[in-house]
Amino acid sequence: MRHDLADFPKIYDDVYRFVDLVKETISNKEKSRAFFKSLNKKDLEQYRDKKHGPYITFDIGCDSDVTLDNQITEHSNYPGHIIDIINQVAEIPEAMLSFATKSTELDTFVRHVKNPKMCRIRLSLMLEWQRQILELNTAKIIDRIEAINKLVNAGFEVHINLSPIVITKSFVKDYGDLLSLLNEKLNEKAKAQLAYEIIFLTHSEKLFDFVQQFAPKAHQMMVNNQFPLEPKPNKENVLSYSPEDKKTYKQIMETLIKKHTPYARIRYMF
């Protein structure tokens, strides 16, 4: 089970003070060291999920791409503050870190992370033609796929984050082609440890309006009369696909994964 850092208020009495500390942690080397040293075995034990095995996993890459954050502080004598944090956590036997990235510029991580098996990298993948509309100026999907082999060979655990899943008329062919490409390009070592995290498109109403104004092509893709977004039950100002559409396409995705990458498991899908 993965936990966001902000899910650990019991370590500190004031959850907001804790969140503020975490924000400072990823921007201040000395405070990050003090923070992770404060996480003793007793703190970690209360969050253990036996289904997850021996480790408690801290997610440090939900709101931003930390590989890019790392580049800001990287210089000739210092590999960057995110790598520094990863190496600190590796000293805690019960803890590991995880983050998602769209970047393929990961050589610094390969060279300087001391214990890569204690770091799970989630490579974000989507359809290439959708990337060219929704994620301009990010790494090509084929390059991200090829990066998986390199990271696994270096000792990292690498999962695939399929996100955002945008439902279109060509869904079955498009994702069949993507998963077939994965099967073709991944080496056996990468396949043996592969797992998926799958997230269907979800939008806040404010962000939806912003995209409509400043990214009309992306908005046009998301506004699909056949698969409309609608307010999510019990979630104020959140838009998603209807429960019926999502149920149908989750089943289709499961079938495609079993067909093209039967060795991979699905960690979660929503």
Indicate where each model-derived feature is located.
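Catalytic cores of alpha/beta
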Residues: 170-185
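Glycine-rich S-adenosyl-L-methionine
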Residues: 138-151
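Structural preference for beta-strand elements that scaffold enzyme active sites
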Residues: 55-59, 96-98, 118-122, 157-161, ...
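Aromatic/hydrophobic pocket-lining residues that form the small-molecule binding cavity
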Residues: 82, 141-144, 175, 246, ...
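Conserved radical SAM core fold
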Residues: 60-70, 103-108, 119-138, 164-169, ...
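Conserved Radical SAM active-site core
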Residues: 1-122
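A conserved active-site cap/scaffold subdomain adjacent to cofactor or substrate pockets
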Residues: 152-158, 162, 169
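Auxiliary Fe-S-binding modules of radical SAM enzymes
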Residues: 183-270
